[in-house]
């Protein structure tokens, strides 16, 4: 993403709308001398603080970091529907990814309503024979029905 500031006034801000990005690092390049007062990352997720349930802390900093990364993975991927990754344009509700992470997600947060809505997407996307898709809601690809691993989500997630 590239944004050019107008250069008017002492302070300018930029806040993208109708999009989100998954990232670990941010790079800012300026052609002129600038003073950056602050850069703020705003998490966007369907998991609210009120939904959070489980918490675990160990005496090992590496394990605690793994737990934190897992929690942030949930925050990053649970946005209206469970996605497989927030950093690509794809951002689809891949069913295999969801069924693998669902149990962990339910430890960290009360995801009942969130998953109930997504399971309705699964039912709406079922084939006439009852097969579940690879992606829910139905999308431009990932629509092969009854694929082992992906279709299993229709039984494992609920």
For every predicted segment, state its role.
Residues 1-87, 113-118, 128-129, 133-142:
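Extracellular/oxidizing-compartment recognition motifs
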Residues 56, 60-63, 94, 108, ...:
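Solvent-exposed, acidic/flexible segments
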Residues 85, 91-98, 124-158:
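Aromatic-lined, polymer-binding surfaces characteristic
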């Amino acid at each position: 993403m590239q944004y050019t500031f107008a250069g008017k006034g002492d302070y300018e801000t930029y806040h993208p709308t109708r999009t989100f990005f998954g990232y670990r690092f941010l790079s800012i390049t300026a052609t002129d001398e600038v003073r950056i007062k602050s850069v703020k990352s705003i998490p966007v997720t369907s998991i609210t603080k009120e939904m959070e349930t489980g918490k675990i802390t160990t005496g090992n900093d590496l394990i605690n970091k793994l737990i934190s990364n897992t929690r942030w993975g949930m925050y990053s991927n649970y946005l209206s529907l469970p996605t497989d990754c927030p950093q690509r344009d794809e951002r689809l509700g891949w069913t295999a990814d969801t069924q693998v992470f669902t149990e962990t997600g339910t430890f960290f947060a009360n995801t009942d309503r969130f998953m109930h809505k997504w399971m309705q997407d699964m039912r709406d996307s079922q084939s006439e024979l009852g097969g579940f898709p690879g992606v829910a809601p139905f999308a431009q690809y990932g629509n092969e029905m009854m694929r082992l691993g992906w279709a299993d989500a229709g039984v494992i997630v609920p």
